[in-house]
């Protein structure tokens, strides 16, 4: 389009799904493909040049399409909470973001405990989780109080208070999902007496997406595509997705 460097024509690119809003001076303002502007579930999409990142790899288009939301969300969470070589818990670990977080946290040298259903435990260990915890188990009983350095949460829900109980003093908690429920109970004493830090994570700096592309090009992560559908079967694809029978 007009204003785009002609040298970029023919590039293979990935487009950030969540983008900084050019209509706002607020650096935290964002817009999402398929929400604030058209392009989700579409054959073609108009994208800004500065939100289109070149990628050089032998992955298929379908494999690359699995990356922008799940892996950038996961990498953004890990960057926000500064995950390092430490013991962490990932909730909702068998979902798209959770399984991406396992691979990305492994690159950082973290020891990973993945919370999931029993039938998905072995697959998550193959991705890099050292241990798995049944999502229905009591985390305090299984892991113990003050047992992990950080929690990467995609679930929320009624068991949320246990996530702060298992954090060590000075621990960090980062969240970017609430599939089990967005309303939780917080005992402020756990927060201030243990000197915990809580992070929300949605808007990412461009370097987060650049990190993900570098991991792809260096062969450090692998795509997880369980099934693909033609665009006209999008309703069927969504129904299969909601069955949650795959990683």
Where are these regions (language model features)?
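Glycine-rich beta-strand-centered segment in the early N-terminal region that forms part
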Residues: 1-22, 58-59
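Short glycine-centered segments of the SAM/dcSAM-binding site in methyltransferase folds
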Residues: 12, 87, 111, 171-172, ...
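N-terminal Rossmann-like NAD(P) cofactor-binding module of classical short-chain dehydrogenase/reductase
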Residues: 14, 149-152, 174
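Glycine-rich phosphate-binding loop and adjacent beta-alpha segment
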Residues: 29-30, 158-224
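A glycine-rich, Thr/Ser-enriched phosphate-binding loop motif common to dinucleotide/cofactor-binding enzymes
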Residues: 36-41, 57-80, 94, 100, ...
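C-terminal hydrophobic helical "lid"/dimerization subdomain
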Residues: 76, 206-247
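Conserved N-terminal Rossmann-fold NAD(P)-binding element of oxidoreductases
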Residues: 88-92, 176
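Adenosine-nucleotide cofactor-binding segment
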Residues: 90-91, 106-161
């Amino acid at each position: 389009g007009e204003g785009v460097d002609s040298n970029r024509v023919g590039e293979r690119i990935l487009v950030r799904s969540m983008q900084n809003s050019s209509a706002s001076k607020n650096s935290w303002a964002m817009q999402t493909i398929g929400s604030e502007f058209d392009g989700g579930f579409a054959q073609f999409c108009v994208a800004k040049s500065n939100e289109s990142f070149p990628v050089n790899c032998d992955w298929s288009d379908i494999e690359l399409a699995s990356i922008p939301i799940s892996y950038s969300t996961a990498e953004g969470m890990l960057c926000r909470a500064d995950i390092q070589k430490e013991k962490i818990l990932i909730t909702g670990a068998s979902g798209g973001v959770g399984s991406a977080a396992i691979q990305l946290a492994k690159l950082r040298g973290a020891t990973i405990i993945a919370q999931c259903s029993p039938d998905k435990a072995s697959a998550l260990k193959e991705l890099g989780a050292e241990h798995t915890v049944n999502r229905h188990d009591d985390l305090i009983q299984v892991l113990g109080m003050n047992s992990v350095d950080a929690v990467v949460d995609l679930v929320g829900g009624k068991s949320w208070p246990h996530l702060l109980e298992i954090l060590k003093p000075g621990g960090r908690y980062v969240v970017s999902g609430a599939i089990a429920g967005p309303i939780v109970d917080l005992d402020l004493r756990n927060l201030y007496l243990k000197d915990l830090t809580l992070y929300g994570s949605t808007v990412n700096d461009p370097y987060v997406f650049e990190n993900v592309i570098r991991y792809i090009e260096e062969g450090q992560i692998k795509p997880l595509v369980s099934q693909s559908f033609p665009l006209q079967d999008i309703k069927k694809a969504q129904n299969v997705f909601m069955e949650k029978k795959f990683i």
